[in-house]
A protein has these predicted regions:
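Sec-dependent N-terminal signal peptides
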Residues: 4-12
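Positively charged n-region of N-terminal signal peptides that target proteins for export
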Residues: 1-4, 18
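Cyclophilin-like peptidyl-prolyl cis-trans isomerases
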Residues: 16-231
Length: 231
């Protein structure tokens, strides 16, 4: 099953780099930002949208004005992790709230675990996760790294896509939590920090300690049972 993820999720997988991992360097893409269209009308039912690179920015600008929640709870196999999302990174906060309300993260996994570095979640190698992605759409988010947030321990950040991506556009379906003591500041500027753990770092540490295979995938799957809005 783990091989399947390369086949049907490869275009949006993470590329959060550590000292052993390099991000592909590729030809820049032209901007796909377009003016607000009827397809991105904020009065249209949100459930009717299929997001893409042309409408995602306008959609989340409108979504941000109506959905002001900022605190979420991640229920994992090892316990609860509460996260506060930063208002300053509005696209990433709104994206996380949107996916939470869509129940996208439910039954995904922490699929990349590196002790004293990060735990990365929001993906899976099963077909239900693929189908949820297809219903939501295919899109990337801008790198919004200049809001003053650093990759300190406990910070929540968004990895970049593994596709041709010199601007480190963010893969919206995944996130990682910095577990490293003292932070992982070599990531600053390359990835968008959009939240922080306010309760449950002991759970993060437990997940970071699980045995993994050569690709950093836990030998025993660590599930995100659900993500819910607290306030």
């Amino acid at each position: 099953m783990r091989i399947l993820i390369i086949l049907f999720l490869g275009s949006t997988l993470f590329s959060c780099e550590d000292k052993k991992t390099k991000v592909n360097k590729i030809v820049p893409k032209k901007s796909t930002s377009t003016p607000l269209t009827k397809d991105v009308n904020p009065e249209k039912k949100e459930s009717d949208f299929i997001l893409n690179d042309k409408n995602v920015m306008e959609f989340f600008l409108a979504y941000d004005k109506k959905h002001l929640e900022s605190t979420v709870r991640i229920t994992t196999d090892f316990g609860l992790i509460d996260i506060r999302l930063f208002e300053a990174t509005k696209f990433h906060r709104s994206n996380f709230i949107y996916l939470t309300k869509k129940k996208y993260f439910d039954q995904t996994q922490f699929y990349r675990v590196i002790p004293n570095f990060v735990i990365q979640g929001g993906n899976s190698d099963d077909r239900p996760t693929l189908r949820k992605r297809q219903k939501i759409g295919k899109y990337l988010l801008p790198n919004d790294h200049d809001k003053g947030f650093k990759h300190n321990r406990g910070m929540v950040s968004m990895p970049s896509s593994s596709i041709e991506n010199p601007y480190k556009l963010a893969s919206p379906f995944e996130f990682f939590i910095v577990q490293q003591q003292g932070g992982a500041h070599h990531l600053d500027g390359d990835y968008t920090v959009f939240g922080t753990v306010i309760n449950g770092m002991d759970v993060v540490d437990k997940i970071a300690a699980v045995p993994t295979d050569s690709s950093d995938w836990p030998l025993q799957n660590v599930f995100i049972q659900k993500v819910e809005i607290l306030e």
